[in-house]
């Protein structure tokens, strides 16, 4: 067994097969692959493709509808639960007494902002909630008490309580219950712990603990007479603070000017008045209508000029921002176009590899076809000679050599044609990618000076900030123009490249179909050999 295995013929390695095929003139695939020049764009395209979300089955939705009324604690925190249980939903509306909703409108809850509608002795910590309870003990200094009787304690300083008997400390609260008016003064509470000195109420019943209000009389009678100082007691008239003064000193609406001293009086040491003012001084109390019209016109013109300057600067700032945004979008479009063109270059390289592999496959298929024909001839009957006619051996050899030569030339032509197309595509894509859309620093310097000199025609009292904005606007517009030209070139290059690759893809498709047919025919011929 060992001796037989030792003398058994070994299988040839791949390298030996390649050498044997090369020795007989059969084309083989070389290990020296072409270096990729757009491999980075291929990796970028693969990363972008991997970043896309994949499709998956729908299931495990944590926000699905849950049947109400269950008493488990694993419910949807956002589902509407109408049962009597307490769930983890902080925003649901529940009618239970121990609901944890701080925003619901429950009867008795811990809502600091909700309106309590209960009639029992509940307590609400809401500092802003309007209550409908009666007999409210409140410290609201601004609240209005308008309701019936209940018993509820609240600490809201702004709440509106609706009670008849208000035990309030509000110095400004006003009651709407009116039982009459006596003598022009009133009390605003039936049994008030503190009188409101500013309320305009209408109650007539007085309390022993109330104080006289000096400003509570309604402003219906205007009179400047006052008989009891500031008191608003049993008097026939009250002081109206809103009345228009009718005193003599308020009749003159024009400013009073000091009379100038007569220039005819001799100025000597005896009649010299040191307190006298010589010349007409400017009165700061003059009305605007009495200012000279020329001065008003000058001031209005100056204001209009300043307003125009501000408008010009504002428009310039808007133009700068607009050009910046446009330049940013142009740069983004340029980056996107460059990446797209680079991915087209990587695609062109892969198309070239596919063309080379198809060409090699066609050559191998032709060789396989010849081998199948030879095998069929050798498998004939022993009575039929397999060597052929010995008298035309030289002519058959010449025909075979001519056929091999033609096949080799055709293969070389196709390979060179593919290489030329690949080189043209590579150069076209390189030119589109390496095209610089910006100019050098020297060009930008002279261009800025030229733009600044041209901008002086429509500038008004410009400063350094205006000059900088004009330079930036001109520079941004120039760069936008350069990017627009580059984008146009990228678009044309991509269009040409896509058309070229479409043509190559059609050729690859035709070659692949032809190769498939030839392989199928060789397989059928091998199966028919017996």
Curated annotation (Swiss-Prot):
* An annotated GO BP: hyphal growth
Protein name, UniProt field: Protein transport protein SEC9
Gene for this chain: SEC9
Concerning its family, UniProt says: Belongs to the SNAP-25 family.
Gene Ontology cellular component annotations, sorted alphabetically: plasma membrane; SNARE complex
What organism does the UniProt record list as the source? Candida albicans (strain SC5314 / ATCC MYA-2876) (Yeast)
SMART domains documented for this protein: t_SNARE
Cite the GO molecular-function annotations of the record: SNAP receptor activity; syntaxin binding
Q: Where in the cell is it found?
A: Membrane
Which domain of life does this protein belong to?
Eukaryota
Q: Where is the composition biased (Low complexity)?
A: 61-100, 122-141, 161-202
Record note on disruption phenotype = Leads to defects in secretion of degradative enzymes and defects in hyphal extension.
Q: Where is this region: Disordered?
A: 1-274
């Amino acid at each position: 067994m060992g001796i037989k295995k030792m003398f058994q013929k070994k299988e040839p390695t791949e390298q030996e097969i390649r050498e044997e095929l090369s020795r007989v003139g059969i084309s083989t695939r070389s290990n020296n692959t072409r270096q990729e020049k757009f491999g980075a764009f291929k990796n970028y395209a693969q990363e972008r493709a991997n970043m896309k979300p994949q499709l998956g089955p729908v299931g495990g939705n944590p926000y699905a509808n849950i049947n109400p009324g269950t008493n488990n604690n694993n419910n949807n925190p956002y589902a509407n639960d109408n049962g009597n249980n307490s769930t983890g939903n902080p925003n649901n509306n529940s009618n239970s007494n121990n609901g944890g909703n701080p925003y619901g409108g429950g009867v008795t809850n811990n809502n600091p902002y909700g309106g309590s509608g209960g009639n029992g002795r509940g307590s609400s910590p809401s500092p802003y909630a309007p209550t409908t309870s009666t007999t409210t003990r409140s410290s609201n200094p601004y609240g209005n008490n308008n309701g019936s009787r209940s018993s509820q304690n609240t600490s809201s300083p702004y709440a509106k309580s609706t009670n008849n008997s208000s035990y309030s400390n509000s110095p400004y609260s006003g009651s709407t219950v009116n039982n009459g008016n006596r003598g022009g003064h009133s009390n605003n509470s039936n049994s008030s712990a503190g009188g409101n000195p500013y309320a305009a109420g209408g109650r007539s019943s007085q309390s022993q603990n109330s104080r006289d209000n000096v400003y509570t009389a309604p402003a219906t009678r205007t009179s400047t007479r006052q008989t009891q100082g500031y008191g608003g007691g049993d008097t026939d008239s009250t002081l109206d603070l809103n009345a228009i003064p009718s005193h003599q000193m308020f009749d003159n609406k024009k400013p009073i000017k000091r009379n100038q001293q007569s220039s005819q009086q001799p100025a000597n040491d005896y009649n010299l008045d040191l307190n006298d003012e010589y010349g007409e001084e400017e009165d700061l109390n003059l009305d605007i209508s009495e200012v000279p019209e020329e001065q008003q016109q000058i001031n209005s013109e100056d204001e209009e000029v300043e307003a125009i300057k501000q408008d010009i600067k504002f428009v310039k700032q808007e133009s700068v921002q607009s050009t910046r945004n446009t330049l940013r979008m142009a740069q983004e479009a340029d980056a996107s176009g460059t990446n797209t063109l680079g991915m087209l270059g990587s695609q062109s390289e892969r198309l070239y590899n596919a063309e080379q592999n198809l060409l090699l496959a066609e050559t191998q298929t032709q060789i396989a076809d010849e081998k199948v024909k030879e095998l069929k001839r050798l498998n004939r009957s022993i009575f039929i000679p397999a060597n052929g006619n010995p008298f035309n051996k030289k002519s058959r050899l010449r025909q075979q050599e001519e056929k091999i030569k033609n096949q080799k030339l055709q293969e070389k032509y196709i390979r060179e044609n593919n290489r030329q197309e690949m080189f043209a595509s590579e150069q076209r894509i390189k030119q589109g990618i390496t095209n610089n859309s910006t100019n050098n620093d020297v060009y930008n310097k002279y261009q800025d000076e030229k733009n600044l000199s041209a901008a002086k025609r429509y500038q008004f009292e410009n400063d350094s900030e205006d000059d900088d904005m004009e330079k930036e606007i001109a520079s941004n517009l120039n760069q936008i123009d350069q990017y627009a030209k580059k984008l146009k070139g990228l678009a044309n290059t991509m269009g040409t490249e896509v058309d070229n690759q479409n043509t190559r893809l059609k050729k690859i498709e035709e070659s692949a179909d032809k190769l498939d047919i030839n392989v199928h025919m060789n397989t059928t011929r091998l199966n028919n050999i017996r």
